[in-house]
């Protein structure tokens, strides 16, 4: 709410008239993230133009689908916004209501990505997805845990977890499996709302994934990909130059292929 630029919610559908259940992909599209009122340190804030890497990966997938003429129905949901301080900005202590009616206490405005993803995940229910996968540069905790060469995958089924990791390995994009243990969910409970948008310091990437799980349509196989590490590089090596890497595009393309054959 602090930005002068209105938020946008982009819906892409490769075959809207198809009867089959689609593969639905959700991408975090924070076009610049200052942290809001909970302001980030100045160092490396310029890299936060890359906080839309999840949404960009899905746009890359749709470009590939268009170029190859894939017949599989794919839906992309891209919640896009800036997170900046301002007179109308969300404040720590505010309570907001998500699309599915869940109330969320905002304790840190720099945990904004999970809020826009939550609404997009809830919105996906109208498409009755065969699978639901979200991509996001979601947590610094994931970057600290796994470094810059691998993304985290949190999946509700072993099959989807295996498909993502195996297809990622085919194209040089690596994923490490992470838990969605129910006993970790307790610190997300709020005394004034259904959930808090942050929990305790330790295990931050897991808490973020467990927060998102509350918004996944019932009975849908879901995976959350935290790509905070490999989505950006400072190196000038291999096929990459400093900046965004496009991580995830090739994995998603291979994943679509496995559901098409």
Which residues does each predicted region cover?
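A generic structural signal for tightly packed, nonpolar segments enriched in small/aliphatic residues
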Residues: 1-261
């Amino acid at each position: 709410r602090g930005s002068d630029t209105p938020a946008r919610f982009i819906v892409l559908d490769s075959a809207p008239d198809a009867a089959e259940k689609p593969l639905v992909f959700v991408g975090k599209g924070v076009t610049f993230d200052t942290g809001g009122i909970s302001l980030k340190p100045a160092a490396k804030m310029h890299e936060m133009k890359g906080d839309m890497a999840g949404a960009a990966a899905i746009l890359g997938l749709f470009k590939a689908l268009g170029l190859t003429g894939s017949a599989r129905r794919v839906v992309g949901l891209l919640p896009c916004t800036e997170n900046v301080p301002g007179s109308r900005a969300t404040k720590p202590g505010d309570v907001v209501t998500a699309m599915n009616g869940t109330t969320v206490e905002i304790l840190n405005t720099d945990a904004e990505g999970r809020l826009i993803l939550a609404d997009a995940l809830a919105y996906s229910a109208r498409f009755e997805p065969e699978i639901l996968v979200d991509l996001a540069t979601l947590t610094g905790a994931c970057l600290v845990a796994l470094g810059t060469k691998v993304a985290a995958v949190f999946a509700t089924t072993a099959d989807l977890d295996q498909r993502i990791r195996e297809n990622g390995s085919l194209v040089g994009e690596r994923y490490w499996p992470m838990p969605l243990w129910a006993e970790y969910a307790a610190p997300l409970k709020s005394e004034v709302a259904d959930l808090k948008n942050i929990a305790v310091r330790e295990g931050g990437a897991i808490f973020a994934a467990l927060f998102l799980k509350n918004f996944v349509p019932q009975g849908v196989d879901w995976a959350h990909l935290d790509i905070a590490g490999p989505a950006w590089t400072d190196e000038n090596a291999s096929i990459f130059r400093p900046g965004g890497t496009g991580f995830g595009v090739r994995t998603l393309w291979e994943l679509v292929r496995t559901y098409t054959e």
